[in-house]
């Protein structure tokens, strides 16, 4: 019998109803790393109201050709001023890290400059902050039915409108999110 732990790097975490933390209601989190040392993920379903990628580049003094009116996402409650770019594998500049052979994550100004100049990855999204778990914490939340794990598709990650990502991710996993409940029953 294989007793090796299951790690969720490269998967999507979907918050279940009644997760118990309002910051994570309807969250979709792209897992960047998960191992015996803990876990880190970036939220991809909660745009920060009024904040666009173009505005962030303007704040950083990075020129850009296009308006770049894509939203910036609340990546999580940890280090909310730290930026991350989750992107396709067709760009691998300074500090780009491959995540489970699926997508990449970068946090340097190099990728922001590349996006501003129109030479960045073909698919990307920008987030501020991240969700982090200490060793064993995420596993404990899984036991308490806080999260559902699913592979999720690149189309879900990059093309689905943020307001639909949570429900669409469940649908991809074969689950009708409208039928999820916080109530349990007895048999």
Swiss-Prot record:
It comes from the Bacteria. GO terms for cellular component: cytosol. InterPro entries: AlgH-like (IPR003774). PANTHER family: UNCHARACTERIZED PROTEIN YQGE, UPF0301 PROTEIN YQGE. Belongs to the UPF0301 (AlgH) family. This is UPF0301 protein Sala_0165. It comes from Sphingopyxis alaskensis (strain DSM 13593 / LMG 18877 / RB2256) (Sphingomonas alaskensis). The lineage of its organism: Bacteria, Pseudomonadati, Pseudomonadota, Alphaproteobacteria, Sphingomonadales.
């Amino acid at each position: 019998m294989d007793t090796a732990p299951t790690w969720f790097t490269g998967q999507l975490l979907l918050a279940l109803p009644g997760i118990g933390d309002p910051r994570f209601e309807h969250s979709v989190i792209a897992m960047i790393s998960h191992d015996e040392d803990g876990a880190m993920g970036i939220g991809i379903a909660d745009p920060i109201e009024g904040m666009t990628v173009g505005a962030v580049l303007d704040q950083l003094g990075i020129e850009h050709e296009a308006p770049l009116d894509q939203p910036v996402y609340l990546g999580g409650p940890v280090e909310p001023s730290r930026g991350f770019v989750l992107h396709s594998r067709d760009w691998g500049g300074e500090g780009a890290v491959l995540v489970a052979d699926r997508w990449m994550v970068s946090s340097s100004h190099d990728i922001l400059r590349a996006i501003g100049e129109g030479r960045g990855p073909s698919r990307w999204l920008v987030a501020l902050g991240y969700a982090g778990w200490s060793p064993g914490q995420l596993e404990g939340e899984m036991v308490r039915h806080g999260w559902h794990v699913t592979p999720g598709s690149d189309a879900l990650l990059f093309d689905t409108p943020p307001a639909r990502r949570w429900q669409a991710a469940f649908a991809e996993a074969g689950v009708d999110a409208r039928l999820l409940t916080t109530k349990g029953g007895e048999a």
